[in-house]
């Protein structure tokens, strides 16, 4: 049972990491230095984990294994706190304190808003 769960998380993490990489390739780096790709995947991942978790908790649509695959696995691999902090440090190092502050504040506030939006949409969808 434990090995099955480890494999589910690994498979989801692989898919999420590849998806994040593809978003980074698709979203051009702006001349401002603002990390739009990481910002977008973290907000989308927050929405997805809210939506998936609500469905898993309040319906029988997702098995515990599917929830593990999609939340801990995919969303965990898709989103990236460490990259966000690395990029924030880079903005600070480059003298872009305003962008760094907006990035951190926007990531936290936007992430929570997306999480709750995903949860609400799942409740309405049921």
UniProtKB/Swiss-Prot annotation:
Membrane-topology descriptor: Multi-pass membrane protein
Residue ranges of the TM segments: 6-26, 32-52, 68-90, 102-122
Superkingdom, taxonomy of origin: Bacteria
Location(s), subcellular: Cell inner membrane
Keyword list, A-Z: Cell inner membrane, Cell membrane, Ion channel, Ion transport, Membrane, Metal-binding, Sodium, Transmembrane, Transmembrane helix, Transport
Chain residues that bind Na(+): 76, 79
Reported regulation of activity: Na(+) is not transported, but it plays an essential structural role and its presence is essential for fluoride channel function.
Gene Ontology cellular-component terms listed: plasma membrane
Pfam family, one: CRCB
Catalysed reactions, semicolon-separated: fluoride(in) = fluoride(out)
A GO BP entry: cellular detoxification of fluoride
GO molecular function, one term: metal ion binding
Functional summary from the UniProt entry: Fluoride-specific ion channel. Important for reducing fluoride concentration in the cell, thus reducing its toxicity.
Similarity-based family: Belongs to the fluoride channel Fluc/FEX (TC 1.A.43) family.
HAMAP family: FluC
UniProt protein name: Fluoride-specific ion channel FluC
Species of the source: Chlorobaculum tepidum (strain ATCC 49652 / DSM 12025 / NBRC 103806 / TLS)
Lineage of source species: Bacteria, Pseudomonadati, Chlorobiota, Chlorobiia, Chlorobiales
């Amino acid at each position: 049972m434990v090995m099955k769960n480890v494999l589910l998380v690994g498979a989801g993490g692989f898919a999420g990491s590849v998806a994040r990489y593809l978003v980074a390739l698709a979203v051009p780096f702006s001349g401002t230095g603002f990390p739009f790709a990481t910002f977008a995947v973290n907000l989308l991942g927050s929405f997805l984990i809210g939506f998936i978790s609500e469905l898993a908790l309040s319906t029988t649509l997702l098995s515990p294994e599917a929830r593990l695959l999609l939340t801990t696995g995919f969303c965990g691999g898709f989103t990236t706190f460490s990259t966000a902090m690395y990029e924030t440090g880079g903005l600070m190092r480059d003298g872009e304190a305003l962008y760094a502050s907006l990035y951190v504040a926007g990531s936290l506030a936007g992430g929570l808003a997306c999480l709750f939006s995903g949860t609400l949409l799942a409740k309405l969808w049921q």
